Amino acid sequence: MSRRFTVTSLPPAASAASADPESRRHSVADPRRLPREDVKGDGNPKESSPFINSTDTEKGREYDGRNMALFEEEMDTSPMVSSLLSGLANYTNLPQGSKEHEEAENNEGGKKKPVQAPRMGTFMGVYLPCLQNIFGVILFLRLTWVVGIAGIMESFCMVFICCSCTMLTAISMSAIATNGVVPAGGSYYMISRSLGPEFGGAVGLCFYLGTTFAGAMYILGTIEILLAYLFPAMAIFKAEDASGEAAAMLNNMRVYGTCVLTCMATVVFVGVKYVNKFALVFLGCVILSILAIYAGVIKSAFDPPNFPICLLGNRTLSRHGFDVCAKLAWEGNETVTTRLWGLFCSSRLLNATCDEYFTRNNVTEIQGIPGAASGLIKENLWSSYLTKGVIVERRGMPSVGLADGTPVDMDHPYVFSDMTSYFTLLVGIYFPSVTGIMAGSNRSGDLRDAQKSIPTGTILAIATTSAVYISSVVLFGACIEGVVLRDKFGEAVNGNLVVGTLAWPSPWVIVIGSFFSTCGAGLQSLTGAPRLLQAISRDGIVPFLQVFGHGKANGEPTWALLLTACICEIGILIASLDEVAPILSMFFLMCYMFVNLACAVQTLLRTPNWRPRFRYYHWTLSFLGMSLCLALMFICSWYYALVAMLIAGLIYKYIEYRGAEKEWGDGIRGLSLSAARYALLRLEEGPPHTKNWRPQLLVLVRVDQDQNVVHPQLLSLTSQLKAGKGLTIVGSVLEGTFLDNHPQAQRAEESIRRLMEAEKVKGFCQVVISSNLRDGVSHLIQSGGLGGLQHNTVLVGWPRNWRQKEDHQTWRNFIELVRETTAGHLALLVTKNVSMFPGNPERFSEGSIDVWWIVHDGGMLMLLPFLLRHHKVWRKCKMRIFTVAQMDDNSIQMKKDLTTFLYHLRITAEVEVVEMHESDISAYTYEKTLVMEQRSQILKQMHLTKNEREREIQSITDESRGSIRRKNPANTRLRLNVPEETACDNEEKPEEEVQLIHDQSAPSCPSSSPSPGEEPEGEGETDPEKVHLTWTKDKSAAQKNKGPSPVSSEGIKDFFSMKPEWENLNQSNVRRMHTAVRLNEVIVNKSRDAKLVLLNMPGPPRNRNGDENYMEFLEVLTEQLDRVMLVRGGGREVITIYS
């Protein structure tokens, strides 16, 4: 459940008013912190926000005073400083752990007891828990063996390196922990909030796996103590000979380990509070055992304990099979053989055949614990690494060896090495003994002052444990015989725990103490690991783990406990403590490495929010700690290190792939920002090299009234061009003012982002609010991008229905867009019939992408189909390139040159040269030009005032009447409908009908009248300031004259304009129309069935009076083609033949 805190504002007059109901109305709880079931977000449902954010505190919304009346209207968003400070000062966070369980059990009758504020100090809250978690099974079961194998010098270096690693990590952790209020949840929250959801999830799961395998290691240590030192007779599997003892022991570990794991998981499931209450008992066992070791060291200096060991030559003998360390014994006056004789000879008789080594060497007995004053430290100073199956021998003892290659009988009672040892292996086995430094930060919610207690308690605990470990290395080497140290299971000292032989007053103190301490550590791991997994699951950054965020009603992570037990069982099935230890070393080292990385990144970035209260840190220390962790990972086991890093990398990429939506203000985001800033500043130094040129797209989309993208196919096409690996900015313009339309802009931006995510477009979204569309588009073109990372290509759709639009600003905006991209040296891509472009799910199984290379304005025409064919939609389409040859061109040579050029460009395409001979301008072209100019003339009239328009139309009518007497009427008529303005405007009536030529094959457009039988569009318009133009096509192919359609609206005047003489037409327009018609004929002939046609887009006229003619040219050029992309280069894009 969520915890809410209440900030109460009292009038300054009376403190007794707090009992008044009126004063209680100032206590306002944040509704976002009300109890709820499905807690999402930061993974800690009991954490209220400690950040200074006015939206998090609704205190002060009811204001009665007059002193601050100037700010009374802003009280809903800006609370009073007094209430804010009160809320921050009283901020508390409950611990994550067994508190939920205890609270649920203490709640009776639906009433909750008031939650006591945490009162734990540094000693009880941090120091002792860290001691309990750091001291563990390795200290009691393996440290003596490590010292015996590696020697005092190498063991000292090993312990020093490992302790330095944890000390440097603790310094980094202290800096992170004191950088603000520490939320309950500990190390995972510090890492995830410092490094972001991707690293946080990856490292959090590695930390969870490490904690889980630590539980397996503690359970295996418990079983080893139980079967090897407490109750050896409990072993289920017995070895028939010495060679089978190791396998039998592993099977016993698996069986008993599974049973102990089941019991521990049941205890954790039933009553977690008992685990926490017995934690001090387990800690007492650890401290008592360590004190017993030091007491034994002191006693051994003047009164060494009696633990004799038996040597045959220089070989160590196991005490399991005999009692007297001698070959012969005296019984009365008779010499008899001992049990040791029987182990090496065929019988107990003196004349029996005995082992050759046994015959040649004497049996001697020495003290296993000579004591600190014995000077043994010199002998144990250097290493004695062993291979598996080798007998443990004492250096310096006389021995008569055997011939080389003589096999050793494994049934003889020697002490054998059970594994091959080397330095890196010992590091992996030893390192888990220094883990557990996060115990204090994990209890941050219990602490009175976490920012003070965590650094002090953790560093003191590490210093204490490091001193114990380093001193133990020296003392073990100074007090215990080397062969005993190398005897892992104490076979030479009657099966006693080696470290127990040094303890005072009895070895049983160590045995029993270590047994309970390992049990307690295992229970703690099974308690903490599920809660860590629950926190990760509740964060929601790893979707498939969200089921483990649920649990019992009291908050216990039932499902997480079940998964933890299953993973822990994997470690138990491994069954070897020496094999499990390096595994958890990997996961803990990776966690510590990222703690150091987080501190180093935050320090180097110097973000304003990085203000740790702990001052004794530096980025060099964090970097050294990170490097040490990484080195130790590969020193311990390079293949385990690679596996751990692979697991973390897969988790990272999975979280990144699924889209981590958490924003925690983490250091990696800051690192990305700094890297982006550095890269952008580098890009500012100069334009990109030719080889680095790639299309950086600015996609201009239009949104409807509901802020949804009108043509999503534009973004599909953008996604299909993603092989360019360039920048993508999707922009849109909303008309209006920023103050009024800001919410709509936000909705439009969200809608565009959703569509970008659906179409898998990687890029940015930018919505601009402007008083008019023209200025907004211009702002986007000018200001899109940042620094050197700016767009160089604009992708826009062709303005549909531009003829029909009463507001002719639509196509004027488009032409201005073309001019601005040309002025800015930007490439322009215009998609015509964009609704017919394929979506990403579609696939073309055949077809072609046809490129009509008419003029060379850069390499865009070649590059675009190359990029498109990398996408699954266009992959099976072949590429065809057409170029146009004039009369004086050698078409054969042109084809060869183009083929060679494509070969050097590494582009595969079919090449064809189309010959377009000069021909006379057809009557069809003249008629198209005539219609275009008449329409242009009428469009100009629409921008005149009423009186100017009437005078202009009258002059056209008079001119037309004169033309009728000279020319025959044509078959298509033009009717101008002028709405009725006033009564005085209805004086003149048209004297006669004027008919103009309009070819039947002219391209249909939205402004064309429908076919006969359909109502023409727009006849009901009555806008008094507009003239409506209606074209009516011929009904018959015989081009018979057709009478005018009746006028339905009253008061409408029909004015007719007769076509001017053909010789009066603008010859430039005629030539351009001729080019458009001829090119269109050629393109349609060759590319009618192409899946996509790309061709050069001609530029707009320099004289703005011909803008509407430009639109007509483009319409004629692209008619009867399904999918067209007009490409206009900016002059900077280049496709190069060089590598």
UniProtKB/Swiss-Prot annotation:
Task: Provide the catalytic activity annotation.
Answer: K(+)(in) + chloride(in) = K(+)(out) + chloride(out)
Bridged cysteine pairs (disulfide): 310-325, 345-354
Q: What is this protein called?
A: Solute carrier family 12 member 5
Q: Where is the composition biased (Low complexity)?
A: 1003-1012
Q: Which UniProt keywords apply?
A: Cell membrane, Cell projection, Chloride, Disulfide bond, Glycoprotein, Ion transport, Membrane, Metal-binding, Phosphoprotein, Potassium, Potassium transport, Symport, Transmembrane, Transmembrane helix, Transport
Sites where the protein binds chloride: 184, 414-415, 569
Tissue expression remark: Highly expressed in brain. Not detected in other tissues. Highly expressed in pyramidal neurons and in neurons throughout the cortex, hippocampus, the granular layer of the cerebellum and in groups of neurons throughout the brainstem. Barely detectable in dorsal-root ganglions.
The UniProt entry's GO biological process terms, in alphabetical order, are: ammonium transmembrane transport; cell volume homeostasis; chemical synaptic transmission; chloride ion homeostasis; chloride transmembrane transport; chloride transport; dendritic spine development; hypotonic response
Q: What gene does this protein come from? A: Slc12a5
